[in-house]
Amino acid sequence: MDYILYTYQIEDYHFEMFLQYSLRPLDIQVEVLKIKESWCAILDEAKCKIGNYASRISHFEHFVVLSYYYQGLGEAAISVLNEIKETKLVAGIEHFNMIDNYEMLCCPANLVIASRVKDLASSYKNNLISVEQLEEYIQISALTVDEIIYLYSRLLFPSEFMQLAINDDCNDAQIKKTLLNMYQNIDNQKASLVIAWQMLNKYTRLPKIAWL
């Protein structure tokens, strides 16, 4: 009683099916204020950790560039979040990590109740869907203006970098390699964000980040 047994059987699957499920609205809502408070706390903690790292990471100027860039993105994301009119957003069954992998997509420990656009934003950021597919999902799911604003703010918020800065040793060789890959991908990421902004701006007026 009150337990569910999950078993795994590797089989053919379609990633789009999981994304469609994540967009189905639940009879639950998430508070925008709590999202903002969470992001502010993450940003503050990351800034503190970054300050500690900056004084002892030698010969790794990429880290300094990344830290300023991603802190700027985080602050921009919170600023966009302030454009949302409603106090709550519709929730869906989302994933902590949205990866095109059957076991990860089905793993109960990887599921979370959050705004129903979380997986959609992660899929675009991780290059799992194109901007054309992103727009199709927006139309099919009939996202509200506030959900579109939140979607854009999620695209901006640098969760991956913040998680590395907070939870990992940025002096570690493997982490440095990951950070270097991020640094080398900045231009592509900027272009992807601009393309998304141009598309989303057709549905509602979104603030433009001048330095992107």
Set out the residue ranges of the language-model regions.
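Short, mixed-charge aromatic SLiMs
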Residues: S38-A46, I140-E147, K177-A191
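Active-site acidic catalytic loop and adjacent metal/ATP-binding pocket
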Residues: Y70, I78-L120
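ATP/Mg2+ or Mg2+-diphosphate-binding catalytic cores
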Residues: M162-L212
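Active-site Asp-x-Gly
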Residues: Y102-I149
